[in-house]
């Protein structure tokens, strides 16, 4: 919100958040309008950022695309490949932009190392504490997607082989 509010490229009209406490804080901190109704919000915008738990990405993005709004979705795009394909088809049908936020591409450490990187072999390990919200989607969609995106942007050839292992330890998805 801070960056959008400061940008000359966007007119930030407001936000919608179901968490009343957080919404009040955002409203006061940034002096922007809080919308309580998704239809009212949709009627006043031409693009939307969806920064919600992954499980709600599909329904929200579908709603806004059907309202002919451009959509930026925090990664991962959806919980399933089928839902992602449906959103892509909808965006194409209406000539809209649908963008997934792969923010690691803009990490200064990555952009600096990319200039000197010439990989022959790439291996990625993701280690971190186990967050409660980590149970809503698999680690592949939540974190490994960053590694895959970075690797795809670094290599200048087709991928020959991918090996991956995952197991359920705490949640219903590979953790």
Positions of the model-derived regions?
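N-terminal Rossmann-like dinucleotide-binding module
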Residues: 1-30, 151
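Short, well-ordered coil/turn segments that N-cap beta-strands
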Residues: 10, 46, 69, 94-97
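Short loop/edge segments at beta-strand edges and connector loops
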Residues: 36, 73, 100-102, 163-166
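Beta-loop-alpha module in the N-terminal Rossmann-like domain of NAD(P)-dependent dehydrogenases
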Residues: 30-88
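Conserved acidic residues
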Residues: 13, 46, 120
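Rossmann-like dinucleotide-binding domain that binds NAD(P)(H)
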Residues: 131-175
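Conserved SAM/SAH-binding loop
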Residues: 37-39, 126, 167
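A contiguous active-site-proximal alpha/beta segment in oxidoreductase catalytic domains
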Residues: 78-134
């Amino acid at each position: 919100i801070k960056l959008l509010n400061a940008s000359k490229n966007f007119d930030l009209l407001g936000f919608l958040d179901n968490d009343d406490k957080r919404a009040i804080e955002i409203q006061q901190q940034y002096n922007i309008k809080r919308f309580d109704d998704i239809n009212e919000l949709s009627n006043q915008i031409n693009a939307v950022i969806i920064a919600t738990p992954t499980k709600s990405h599909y329904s929200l993005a579908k709603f806004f695309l059907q309202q002919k709004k451009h959509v930026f979705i925090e990664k991962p795009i959806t919980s399933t490949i089928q839902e992602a394909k449906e959103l892509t088809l909808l965006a194409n049908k209406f000539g809209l932009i649908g963008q997934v936020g792969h923010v690691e591409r803009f990490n200064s450490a990555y952009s600096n190392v990319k200039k000197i990187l010439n990989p022959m072999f790439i291996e990625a390990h993701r280690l971190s504490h186990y967050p409660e919200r980590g149970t809503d989607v698999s680690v592949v969609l939540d974190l490994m997607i960053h590694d895959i995106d970075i690797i795809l942007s670094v290599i200048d050839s087709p991928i020959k082989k991918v090996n991956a292992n995952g197991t359920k330890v705490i949640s219903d998805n590979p953790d």
